Amino acid sequence: MQENLVIVESPAKAKTIEKFLGEDYKVMSSYGHIRDLKKKELSIDPKTLEPDYEIPDEKKKLVSELKSNAKKAKKIWLASDEDREGEAISWHLCEVLGLDEAKTNRIVFHEITKSAILDAIKSPRHLNMDLVNAQQARRVLDRLVGFKLSPVLWRKVKPALSAGRVQSVAVRLIVEREREIQAFHSEPYYRINALFGITNADGSQSEVKAELDTRFKTHEEAVAFLEQCKDAKFAVSNITKKPLRRTPAPPFTTSTLQQEAARKLGFTVSQTMMVAQRLYESGRITYMRTDSVNLSSLAINTSKDEIIKLWGKEYSKTRNYHTHAKGAQEAHEAIRPTFMSQTEIDGTAQEKRLYELIWKRTAASQMADALIDKTTVTIDIAGSQAKFIANGEVVTFDGFLKVYRESTDEDDNNQEEATHMLPVMQVGNVLERREITSTERFSMGPIRYTEASLVHKLEELGIGRPSTYAPTISTIQQREYVQKGDKKGEERTYTVDTLKGTKVTSRERKEMVGSEKGKLLPTDIGIVVNDFLMANFPDIMDYNFTAKVEQQFDQIAEGKEEWNTMMKVFDKSFEPTVDKVMNARSEHKAGERQLGKEPETGKPVFVKIGRFGPVVQIGSADDTEKPRFSQLPSDKSIETITLEEALELFKLPRTIGEFEGSDVVIGAGRFGPYVMHDKKYVSLPKGTDPMKVTLEEAIQLIGEKREQEQKRHIKAFNEDAKLEVLNGRYGPYIAYDGKNYRMPKALHEKAAELSYAECMEIVNNAPEPKGRKRK
């Protein structure tokens, strides 16, 4: 009989831990949850609201192996993660394996190091059923909402849609932000900057840059001010010097890591969590799902030693951080390296970059303040109440800035100029006017969410927890309620007026504004579903309700509330609302909007969500003639399309001529307008009006597409037309019968020389696609 069986969540973790514990311990993995609610049923008792769990088919063999090994072990250690999900995994293991509590130990650790694992073995505890119940409450509530709301969407909006408690609120945030942007009207204003000269004590000249403390609303006011400055004198009236301290940001929580990795490394939220999971399981960092900023005394002391070794005592400052997040869970530490002495690691490029970010943030949190001298100089203008202000900063001690500087979402949108070092000045110094410039600027509207800023907003509102941010953001994109995309900028003209000498000159300049990359944009279906849920289920969509639910989960986790009581109270009001909405009659489906009538026939023109997405429809089902439909191009929105734009879609497809014996046709599909020739399609460039494309322009696009295809095509085979060697983003690959096959790198250079037999050997020996395994 084996002495000890340790069960962890993931196989990677199992391998690492087995090395630490020795021969008396066998370590196995549960690969995440071993049972769950049934997939195709509510799986919840309608009266008691008790969940009905099942072991999925793909887990039955594993469960059998775990049972067999559990029977052989004298003692069992459940070592799933120390959060609500991890506690629930351990409880399910107890239930399914029929474990005896007397010989079952629950152990937890925040890092996978030998000392942490051995310490956990020395201090086991029992299962915490309050944490289990909090997880069950979340799982059951989310199943009730999703399972009961989704059929309502199928009937009232479109088949195959789904709703979720947190995901729907996340979509609401994105839809509302988009509408704020559409409603915003930018207002112009005029900023005045000056360049002055001053003679130094040694006779040399220095420049002083300053900005007027007043901004003008009109061009006329700005020019009038420049005219006023022609004969004015400029003198220093006040100088203030102020020492500033900048303190470092605390160590990473889950959400701040996701935000900084997005800003600094360009990682998606899911990518960050996937890489962090690997770093944790390989013993490089502490547990990555946490809302705590605390550091252990060991981490603080080892950080101090490393900082002193690398930069000296003056750079070290011990700091203790305390968590202020609403409902911060359990006693986790912040995310930090397990060994601060390990400044670099082996691993993938992504692992190295994320580890470096975590290491720097942790080190900076234990470093001295940055010391800065800030000087503000006020410059009077003779004959005017307005004043110029010159700001200068000098970093006298860089402190934590030597290692790390925190980013913000506004970094890319900051229009203000950086501060400068200033020459020595005294009150009464007269400055020489060299140039004063008025620049037309425009008020900044709201900016769209990135994945990182959405995480920040969800956390700010108390919606979700560290374990839910990444899945929520992935889900709303997978379900196509939201898409990550770029917004093309627009060219804008602005005026610049400059006073130099005695002359004011005016000129126009152009700039690109409004271009955005990697922002979260609501789709038409996302907008329609959001509006339907807001109209019919306002409580579910309310930010305060969602945050209150999270607080109730916290109360359950602390043993202050019964989980099934919470479920019954919720379902008592939710179920009647679902029935009422499901049975309500309506002439139109949600999202349907009448734009007007077709002038020639008088038939109504609608825009709505069709089976395959947004469509424009002319006529109704009751008419003698069948309605006509046109897919809405991706650059048009169901909310903003006009009657004129909708009618234009029905002028397509149109034949514009002939090329090489085949018609050249301009059409429009779901992904925008296109050219069709000889059964091949070429997308029109963004912004191109399909009604104005000439035959010559279409032929040029066809030629460019052919060139691209020639570069992509390496080899074809007479033996089988379905087999090709193609050039892709990552080099040559084989395409056969609609599937792609990876080519060994050793063959890349001679891809064009491969025989039919060699290619088919690669196809026939290709590994089966791996199914996704749970953690």
Language-model segment annotations:
Residues 1-140, 148, 408-409, 419:
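Intrinsically disordered, low-complexity regulatory segments
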Residues 231-247, 259, 435-444:
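Positively charged, polyanion-binding regions of nucleic-acid-associated proteins
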Residues 2-5, 16, 25, 150, ...:
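Basic, low-complexity terminal or inter-domain segments flanking catalytic cores
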Residues 258-260, 264-271:
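A conserved hydrophobic secondary-structure block that centers on an alpha-helix together
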Residues 112-196, 241-245:
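C-terminal or mid-to-C-terminal helical accessory/interaction module adjacent to the motor/catalytic core
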Residues 51-56, 264, 461-462:
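Flexible beta-alpha connector loops of hexameric P-loop NTPases
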Residues 80-82, 259-261, 289:
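Short glycine-centered, acidic/aromatic-flanked micro-motifs in structured strand/loop junctions
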